[in-house]
Amino acid sequence: MPVELLKISSESPEEHVVEYAAGFVKRGEVVGIPTDTFYGLSADPFNLSAIEGVFRAKGRPETKALPILVNSVEQALTLVREMPDSFLELANTYWPGPLTLVVEATHRLPLKVTGNTGRVALRWANSKVVSKLIDAVGGPITGTSANLSGYPSCSNAGQIVEQLGNRLPLILDAGDTGGTLASTIVRLDGNEWRVVREGAIPDEQIYKTLHH
């Protein structure tokens, strides 16, 4: 089946489009969606076959965790086993926004989502489409970049079609995201922290937040 491209407004996402996309996610399918950085692949993180579908679409090694998108700090905390103080400090400063926090995952999440590491990468994106989709699905969704593993991230739907072709049933097309930098990824271990990937938020800004 050819992939379906459906227009959506990033400023005022149409409810019927969001509900339509949510139906795919609830059925265990993988949908391409715009975020505040690049396009992502949205699936139900609690559905093992959906998770396998994301890995398959990307050609991603299963040793790599899949980032999870949430709609609030409270929702993120339901996925965290132990919450370091630095988690709330960073989340309350930069969320919603381009910061991904890697922490110990609750046992509620399938181990495969964590890349068999037991750790989960969480982000609250500053995106109305993502926010409305999470509400419509009724819980967190995956947010890994919508590209082939090792290829450039996609800032528009056309690039996803080029890379992933018919591996997806649906892409929500909100035009160009304007993304130039991916989210910054910070790993938290108790009182220890380190920047795993510098992105839209510089390292020194993270340092200042945690050492003010």
Residue spans for each PLM region:
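Active-site-adjacent structural elements in enzyme catalytic cores
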Residues: 1-212
